[in-house]
Amino acid sequence: MIHHIPNVLSKEQVQYFRNEMDKIEWVNGKVTAGTLSATVKRNQQLPEDHPLTHHLSNIILEALGTHPLFLSAAIPLDIIPPLFNRYENQESFGFHVDNSIRRIRGTNERLRTDLSCTLFLSEPEEYEGGDLVVEDTYGYHEVKLPAGDMILYPSTSLHEVTAITSGCRIASFFWVQSMVRDDAERHMLFNLDQTVQNLRMQLGDNHSEVIKLTNLYHNLMRKWAEL
């Protein structure tokens, strides 16, 4: 399931990110690519070990930790610290699949990549081309969101970033290990959680149907969650 997560960052935060990024030198994006994906990857990245990368990454992680739609859709166990990329001058990233296991930089800890995330830091009108194209069982989805918004999709999906024909596309990208690894189970829990939230607003927290559905949600979490 593909989820649009709006307003992860405010417009003011996005502008701060962009201003700070202008102060440092970008590097070849192949440094974080796997063997196969490196053959189709043409972009630039902020250096993984730069203090600014850590600083901006922490701002995103803090924002995600309090974003109700992200928490409902991802059911995150852990998040690989965000990285940042830039596309310009016909740069692109051809169809590929993300590595199933990734190491958290600076540690020996490894995480399973259940969900892939792209947080847009450029407005759609700032560039042409550069669409994120995600392939799933329902076809191809072309994604270009406002700055500060994020797309969340299963890491099992083939995807690409089409060539930039003008302007510049800046984004953050990262992965989530979910407590619920199966996408179909996560989707059911998401729909159930959203239904519970809507009923709470309509009927109140103490209504019997709200309590029953909340009980069902937590029992399914007990059945499916891996910690």
From Swiss-Prot:
Keywords tagged on the record: Dioxygenase, Iron, Metal-binding, Oxidoreductase, Vitamin C
Residues engaged in binding 2-oxoglutarate: 169
Gene Ontology terms for molecular function: 2-oxoglutarate-dependent dioxygenase activity; iron ion binding; L-ascorbic acid binding
Record InterPro entries: Oxoglu/Fe-dep_dioxygenase_dom (IPR005123), PKHD_C (IPR041097), PKHD_hydroxylase (IPR023550), Pro_4_hyd_alph (IPR006620), Pro_4_hyd_alph_FE2OG_OXY (IPR044862)
Enzyme class, spelled out: oxidoreductase
A Gene Ontology BP annotation from the UniProt entry: intracellular iron ion homeostasis
Cysteine disulfide links: none
Gene3D superfamilies: q2cbj1_9rhob like domain (2.60.120.620), Rabenosyn, Rab binding domain (4.10.860.20)
Cofactor(s) essential for the protein: Fe(2+); L-ascorbate
Name listed for the protein in its UniProt record: PKHD-type hydroxylase ABAYE3291
